[in-house]
From Swiss-Prot:
UniProt protein name: Coiled-coil domain-containing protein 106
InterPro entries recorded: CCDC106
UniProt keyword Coiled coil, yes or no: yes
Tagged with keyword Phosphoprotein: yes
Purpose of the protein: Promotes the degradation of p53/TP53 protein and inhibits its transactivity.
Residues the record lists as Phosphoserine modifications: 130
Residue numbers covered by motif Bipartite nuclear localization signal: 151-164
Gene Ontology cellular component annotations, sorted alphabetically: cytosol; nucleoplasm
Organism of provenance: Homo sapiens
Amino acid sequence: MNDRSSRRRTMKDDETFEISIPFDEAPHLDPQIFYSLSPSRRNFEEPPEAASSALALMNSVKTQLHMALERNSWLQKRIEDLEEERDFLRCQLDKFISSARMEAEDHCRMKPGPRRMEGDSRGGAGGEASDPESAASSLSGASEEGSASERRRQKQKGGASRRRFGKPKARERQRVKDADGVLCRYKKILGTFQKLKSMSRAFEHHRVDRNTVALTTPIAELLIVAPEKLAEVGEFDPSKERLLEYSRRCFLALDDETLKKVQALKKSKLLLPITYRFKR
């Protein structure tokens, strides 16, 4: 009896144990279904060779960009210079056309005089051929009128020639031969530029080419801004070098500090805002 009761108890205990299994034990989860979403640090770690090549590429791109910007600014200045030269040439062409028209009009005005004189002489000779005395008087009157018209025509020619060739000597183009001449011409053009507020009109007023002034500008700027550097460059000797070579040496003598002063004076219109024709 005791054995049967113990078996029944164990069976009951077993049954209760089997029923309580799903509630007491934790569910078994497969660890393979969980994946890490955070990236590994090893994936972002690049080799040192790749990093150095990328840095070199960025430096080269920056250098090319800087060179492109400098070239763009130089081209912009060149365009402005060419536009001013174009305006100057247009003014010269307009002046030439207007002077040619005036000469043609003067020529046309002076031409009909002899024709009228010939017509008057022919009419007087043909209309009164029957009367010798009247014919002679008409011929003498025609000759007097012809001589008077001839004198007027000569006076007109003389006045036109004086107007054509009587240009003031101050407006004639002069060739500078030394540094003092370059400085004197530069100051004259600068004064005209400050009055007229136009580079092309200032060059036209003094009958000087823009490129000629630009090639000798470093000499004048060195004498105005930094005359103490003239000892480094030396005096100009026409027997040893040309004026263009001396101007290039003056350009190379302009250091960064002097160039900053020059640019500041150009912005304030105290120097001619003209670009250099030399390169370092």
